[in-house]
Regions:
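Anionic-ligand binding region
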Residues: 9-11, 19-34, 44-50
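C-terminal helical cap(s) of enzyme catalytic domains, especially alpha/beta-barrels
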Residues: 6-8, 74, 90-118
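Glycine-rich phosphate-binding active-site loops on the catalytic face of alpha/beta enzymes
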Residues: 1-2, 35-44, 76-98
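Aromatic/hydrophobic pocket-lining residues that form π-stacking "cages" and hydrophobic walls in ligand
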Residues: 2-3, 22
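Glycine-rich beta-to-alpha transition loops that act as phosphate-gripper elements at the mouths
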Residues: 15-20, 39-41, 60-67
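Short beta-strand/loop segments at the ligand-binding rim of alpha/beta enzyme cores
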Residues: 5-14, 53-61
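Catalytic cores of alpha/beta
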Residues: 21-29, 46, 65-81
């Protein structure tokens, strides 16, 4: 019902899942992409393993994605990156360091651009 409602209003629907069965169930129900959580417990190889027989899947890792692992996830086939605390740093927010937050966002964007340009 949630996926159907999202599509009714032309919104992308990205439910969370972990196991291959959960991921396939979400896509069969019409999900546009599936966020895999907690991705860091399985690592980028898990995405490679999932995508080998099912390359049509659009997956985004969430949980533990940071500047050190972003390229690994993209190289493993991630369609997007779910980045939380590695991008929205509490200390930068508390200090109202918007330039610092913007710099972090640029670093992530640069990694995405560099990784995608390599393929």
């Amino acid at each position: 019902a949630v996926i159907e409602m999202g599509h009714r209003y032309d919104r992308p629907v990205v439910p969370g899942a972990l196991t291959p069965t959960e991921i396939l169930t979400a896509f069969a129900a019409g999900a546009d992409m599936v966020k895999v959580f907690p991705a860091n417990h399985f690592g980028p190889k898990y995405f490679k393993d999932l995508l080998a027989p099912m390359p049509q899947l659009k997956l985004t890792p969430t949980g533990g994605v940071d500047l050190d692992t972003a390229a690994d996830w993209l190289n493993a086939g991630a369609t997007a990156l779910g980045v939380g605390s590695a991008l929205v740093k509490k200390d930068l927010i508390k200090a109202r360091d918007w330039a610092g937050l913007a710099a972090l966002a640029r670093q992530f964007r640069n990694i995405v651009d560099q990784t995608r340009n390599q393929s």
